[in-house]
C-alpha cells in the first residue's frame, strides 16, 4: 500500500507542470487583480472553522478535539495497516458525500422554512381549535349561569303548587259540604212536607170523625132534647144577666 502511494505521488510530480520564478509573479498579479475586481464576499475563515467545529459531535471543545484526533488516528492506522485501501471508490464516495453535503446545505434552509411553515400551520389549527373550544365552554358556562336561579324558581313553583293543591282540597271539601247541606236541606224539606201532609190528613180525619160523631149523636132525640134545653138555659141566663 505504501509503495502504491509512493508511485502515485511520483507520477503526479512528473505530470504536474513546473512553474518558473518568472511566471509566479505574473500569476500572483493576475490573481490579485481578479480578487480586487470580484465583488463576491468571501467567507470568514474563523466562521468556517467554527461551523466545522460545531458540526462535530460533542458538548465541549476538548471532546470535539478528542473525537477529531481519534478519527484521524484511526484513519491513518487503517491506511498504514492496509485495513483500508485508498482507491477510486474512496474518491467517488468523497465526491458523492460532498454533493450530498452541498445539496443539504443549499436545500436545508428551504426545507427548514417549509417545515416551520407546516409546523406553524398545525399550531394555528390547534390554537384555533383550542380557542373555539374555549369559546364554546365559556358560552356554555354563560348559558348555565342564566339558569342559576332555576332552583329558587323551582322551589317557589313547588310552594305555589302545594298552595294550589291545598286550596283545591279546601274547595273540594267545601263543595262536598255544600252538596251535603243541599241534600240534607232537600231531605228536611221533604220531611217537613211529609209532616205537613200527615198533619193535614190527621186534621181531616179528626174533623171527619168529629163531624160523623156529632151527626150520629144528633140522630139521637135525647141528645137533641138536651141540646135544646141547654140552649134555652143559656139564653135565659144571658137575658137574666142583662141589666133591666
From Swiss-Prot:
Entry GO MF terms: proton-transporting ATP synthase activity, rotational mechanism
Transit peptide: 1-36
The keyword Ion transport belongs to this UniProt entry's keyword annotation: yes
Record field: transmembrane: none
Family: Belongs to the eukaryotic ATPase B chain family.
Name used for this protein in its record: ATP synthase subunit 4, mitochondrial
Cellular compartments per GO CC: mitochondrial inner membrane; proton-transporting ATP synthase complex
Localization in the cell: Mitochondrion; Mitochondrion inner membrane
Biological role stated in the UniProt entry: Mitochondrial membrane ATP synthase (F(1)F(0) ATP synthase or Complex V) produces ATP from ADP in the presence of a proton gradient across the membrane which is generated by electron transport complexes of the respiratory chain. F-type ATPases consist of two structural domains, F(1) - containing the extramembraneous catalytic core, and F(0) - containing the membrane proton channel, linked together by a central stalk and a peripheral stalk. During catalysis, ATP synthesis in the catalytic domain of F(1) is coupled via a rotary mechanism of the central stalk subunits to proton translocation.
Superkingdom of origin: Eukaryota
Primary location: mitochondrion
Classification via Pfam families: Mt_ATP-synt_B (PF05405)
InterPro entries: ATP_synth_Bsub_B/MI25, ATP_synth_F0_suB
The species this protein was found in: Paracoccidioides brasiliensis
The keyword Transport appears for this protein: yes
Keywords from the named record: CF(0), Hydrogen ion transport, Ion transport, Membrane, Mitochondrion, Mitochondrion inner membrane, Transit peptide, Transport
Record's subunit section: F-type ATPases have 2 components, CF(1) - the catalytic core - and CF(0) - the membrane proton channel. In yeast, the dimeric form of ATP synthase consists of 17 polypeptides: alpha, beta, gamma, delta, epsilon, 4 (B), 5 (OSCP), 6 (A), 8, 9 (C), d, E (Tim11), f, g, h, i/j and k.
Amino acid at each position: 500500500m505504501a509503495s502504491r502511494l509512493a508511485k502515485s505521488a511520483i507520477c503526479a510530480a512528473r505530470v504536474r507542470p513546473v512553474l518558473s520564478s518568472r511566471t509566479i509573479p505574473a500569476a500572483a498579479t493576475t490573481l490579485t487583480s481578479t480578487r480586487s475586481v470580484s465583488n463576491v464576499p468571501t467567507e470568514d475563515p474563523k466562521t468556517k472553522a467554527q461551523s466545522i467545529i460545531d458540526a462535530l459531535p460533542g458538548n465541549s471543545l476538548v471532546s470535539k478535539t478528542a473525537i477529531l484526533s481519534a478519527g484521524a488516528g484511526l484513519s491513518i492506522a487503517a491506511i498504514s495497516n492496509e485495513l483500508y485501501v485508498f482507491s477510486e471508490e474512496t474518491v467517488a464516495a468523497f465526491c458523492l458525500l460532498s454533493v450530498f453535503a452541498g445539496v443539504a446545505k443549499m436545500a436545508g434552509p428551504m426545507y427548514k422554512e417549509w417545515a416551520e411553515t407546516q409546523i406553524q400551520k398545525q399550531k394555528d389549527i390547534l390554537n384555533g381549535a383550542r380557542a373555539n373550544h374555549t369559546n364554546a365552554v365559556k358560552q356554555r358556562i354563560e348559558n348555565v349561569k342564566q339558569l342559576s336561579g332555576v332552583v329558587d324558581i323551582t322551589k317557589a313553583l313547588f310552594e305555589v303548587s302545594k298552595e294550589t293543591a291545598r286550596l283545591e282540597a279546601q274547595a273540594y271539601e267545601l263543595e262536598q259540604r255544600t252538596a251535603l247541606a243541599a241534600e240534607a236541606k232537600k231531605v228536611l224539606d221533604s220531611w217537613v212536607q211529609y209532616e205537613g201532609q200527615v198533619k193535614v190528613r190527621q186534621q181531616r180525619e179528626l174533623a171527619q170523625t168529629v163531624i160523623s160523631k156529632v151527626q150520629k149523636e144528633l140522630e139521637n132525640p135525647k141528645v137533641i132534647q138536651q141540646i135544646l134545653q141547654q140552649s134555652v138555659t143559656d139564653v135565659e141566663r144571658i137575658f137574666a144577666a142583662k141589666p133591666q
